Design a protein with these regions (language model features):
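Charged, flexible cofactor/metal-binding loops and thiol motifs
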Residues: 239-341
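Conserved ABC transporter NBD signature motif
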Residues: 65-76
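A short, proline-enriched helix->beta-strand linker immediately N-terminal to the Walker B motif
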Residues: 171-175
């Protein structure tokens, strides 16, 4: 069995606050192979972005407690010095943030910002960095890149700024790209263009991608494997086909039930998940989803509120739920029938 390119084991990220310790990520484990895309999906506050900022080493050490293990190509990132992390960021691993306008400096041209990353990690001259910036703008589909390289962020449209951010992230050919909801603020046409761009660039460079989103439709388009997060924990894992076609966790059923489908009748109402996400300052005991779950009675007793269900994986597939496999199959059949009728 080959060693995964990225391995995260029992990751815990807790933040200190005036009111206590916020358990933003609490015991998360996953692997990512070379050239593959892992989609991490969940509601706001589920721990998606916190996880990936921990991988990049971007949490403030004075207010954050991080435990566990993060291995990137065999290197322990949690044991790395800040100088070593600075060498890795932008070079071996990079991130595309959600709001490109807020991430780009308004005082510098697009070309200078892309070239600065290239110069920092390669020692290239200004002329070489400018040529590389034009090359990357060409790769991400910016028209007239030799002219637009001297434009400022406000002169780019939203989709073009996101393309520029992708160009900046890939300028040093990183092996790992973390995309934090990069299509959320874009219209659906530009979203599709950005998704196609990421897939094309992945095929060209062999990049491993972590794609963070709350949109299962986006996951269906780009991911190879899917990790569903809730309340700082993984509640379901599997391939894209397994998670989207035969989900095993009630939370995943809820996410799917809250989305419209093209195949089903138009008069079937969407089914929102009741309640609100848990406070990670004082999270529920047992299964963190149990206060919002419709199946606690089927489990029986107080098991859901008293015991945290294990995430038992078989060939990378599993869900953290006390329902038996037979119950999951039965309830999912009912759920799928409701969606189709």
């Amino acid at each position: 069995m080959s060693t995964p390119f990225l391995s995260v084991r029992d990751l815990r990220v807790h933040f200190s606050s005036e009111d206590g310790m916020v358990k933003a990520v609490d015991g998360l484990s996953f692997d990512l192979d070379r050239g593959k895309t892992l989609g991490i999906v969940g509601e706001s506050g589920s721990g998606k972005s916190v996880t990936n900022l921990a991988i990049l080493g971007l949490h403030h050490p004075d207010h954050t407690e991080i435990e566990g293990e993060i291995l990137l190509d065999g290197q322990d990132l949690l044991a790395a010095s800040e100088r070593e992390l600075e060498r890795l960021r932008g070079n071996k691993m990079a991130m595309v943030f959600q709001d490109a306008l807020a991430s780009l400096s308004p005082y510098h041209t697009i070309g200078k910002q892309i070239g600065e990353t290239f110069r920092k990690h390669t020692g290239a001259s200004k002329q070489e960095a400018r040529a590389r910036a034009i090359e990357m703008l060409t790769k991400v589909g910016i028209p007239q890149p030799n002219l637009r390289v001297d434009d400022y962020p406000h002169q780019f449209s939203g989709g073009m700024r996101q393309r520029a951010m992708i160009a900046m992230s890939l300028v040093c050919d990183p092996a790992l790209l973390i995309a934090d909801e990069p299509t959320t603020a874009l219209d659906v046409t530009v979203q599709a263009q950005i998704m196609d761009l990421l897939k094309d660039l992945q095929q060209e460079f062999g990049t491993s991608i972590i794609f963070i989103t709350h949109d299962l439709g986006v996951i269906a388009d780009i991911a190879d494997d899917v990790l569903v997060m809730y309340g700082g924990r993984c509640v379901e894992r599997g391939t894209k086909k397994e998670v989207l076609r035969t989900p095993q966790h009630p939370y995943t059923w809820g996410l799917l039930g809250s989305m419209p489908t093209l195949e089903g009748p138009v008069d079937v109402p969407l089914s929102p998940i009741p309640g609100t996400p848990p406070s990670l300052l004082n999270p529920p005991t047992g299964c963190r989803f149990h206060p919002r779950c419709s199946f606690t009675e089927q489990v029986g007793g107080d098991r859901c509120s008293a015991q945290q269900p294990p995430l038992d994986l078989v060939s990378g597939r599993g869900a953290a739920c006390h329902l038996t496999p037979e119950q999951r199959a039965e309830f999912f059949t009912d759920f799928a029938g409701t969606r189709a009728n």
